[in-house]
């Protein structure tokens, strides 16, 4: 009897993992996403209060960068078109943050245990990065287009006009 209970509880636990990591089916409707993901709603609202970055901007960045996939990675590079040689970059997670930028965020924000696969941490990262962009490059936090260009290209890439 005890083994049956353990097996059943293990099965329920494993199945529930899939429920919590499932990609939202209606990715083009922010209200639907947040209605079905209360923890995501709390995260984007907290980031809005902390960094002054709108939930709409956060969700737009995450949708564009990872399609709401926690473990999103960049495509592989291939040698001679067939032998995989690594990834295009170290971008990973919801926010597709690069290793160096993520390390900078963890050190600067004090969030040393942050994980790129955690939605709340990714939301906070985006808020922090937009705040950094506002301070360093003077792009308004409400200028979603220019903020995204700076996010995607990096501060140096944006300043050099690499996006043009």
Give residue ranges: language-model regions.
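Catalytic glycan-binding domains that act on GlcNAc-containing polysaccharides
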Residues: 18-164
